[in-house]
Amino acid sequence: PQMAVIWTPENRFRIWFEVEAHACDAMAELGIIPKAAAKAIWDGGAKAMAALKASPAAEVEKIDAIERVTKHDVLAFTTWLADYVGPDSRFVHQGLTSSDVLDTTFAVQLTQASDLLLEGIDKVLAALKKRALEHKHTPTIGRSHGIHAEPTTF
């Protein structure tokens, strides 16, 4: 279940928003867009993310409906986001390509998935260590070149 959540549209859209909003922060720091606009994007985005969390299926369907018209996933998302952000949404995605957003999001998702896998590996290693210590002195048949050899222990 945890791994599946990483690959849901809701998580993908949440990461898209964060990528877009952080890009706006950077552009505001450089004086490319007003700092107030970056704040408005975060504020409106927080409302959008709350709506996405409260009614994921309905909000994803809204984005999907826009995409069926625009034939463009990121444009559909930014259009949906604009309903929550308002006039300052014109600064969202400015200076970015869709690949900037998609590739960064994919990297974040891979990191999230890797973290889960590493957590699982730690549990497997702990279980293996426990079993190895438990059977440290358990006798077994040794093998050499695929045939039985002298007895040994695990």
Question: What is each of the regions a protein language model found here?
Answer:
Residues 1-154:
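A helix-coil-helix interface module used to build multimeric assemblies
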